């Protein structure tokens, strides 16, 4: 960077417009992780991610290719959360407390003793299916304030990354 650019939490960008795009994709990646857990089960665990201004890439442990209907269910679930315009909140807590609370975390992550836990939802609206947080994850941020800021989420590719590891590439529009 040579002293130029923006750094917010886990993301870096060359300007504010780029940071806004990456922030939308970053929060969408959290929703993708949570949706994969809900659709495929808790054997899913993150192995890595990469966010550019064009797309997010998410690598996770899973032992087979996803079926087209599973990909659609994941994508639909993420978009349902986006349309619900859920509030994204953050709280600081000791790492062990965060893990016990059920917050997702990157197994290779090197975390400080006190971490930020970002939660998406619950919804305050009556009749909402989101009475509990949809996503709860240890992260440095930054994130959108409401999921409605993300835009439409679309999975563009699902493939093998390595033995037992799948990769999803997705965009927001």
Write out the residue ranges for each language-model feature:
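A glycine- and charged-residue-rich anion-binding loop/surface
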Residues: 1-173
């Amino acid at each position: 960077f040579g002293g130029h650019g923006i750094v917010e939490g886990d993301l870096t960008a060359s300007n504010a417009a780029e940071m806004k795009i990456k922030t939308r994709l970053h929060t969408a990646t959290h929703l993708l992780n949570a949706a994969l857990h809900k659709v495929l089960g808790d054997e899913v665990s993150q192995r890595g991610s990469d966010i550019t201004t064009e797309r997010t890439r998410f690598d996770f442990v899973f032992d087979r290719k996803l079926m087209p209907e599973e990909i659609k269910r994941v994508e639909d679930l993420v978009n349902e959360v986006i349309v619900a315009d859920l509030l994204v909140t953050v709280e600081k807590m000791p790492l062990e407390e965060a893990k016990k609370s059920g917050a997702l975390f990157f197994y290779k992550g090197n975390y400080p003793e006190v971490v930020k836990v970002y939660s998406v939802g619950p919804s305050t609206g009556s009749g909402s299916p989101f009475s509990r947080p949809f996503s709860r994850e240890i992260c440095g941020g930054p994130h959108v304030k409401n999921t409605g800021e993300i835009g439409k989420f679309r999975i563009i590719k699902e493939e093998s990354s390595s033995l037992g590891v799948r990769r999803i590439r997705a965009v927001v529009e």
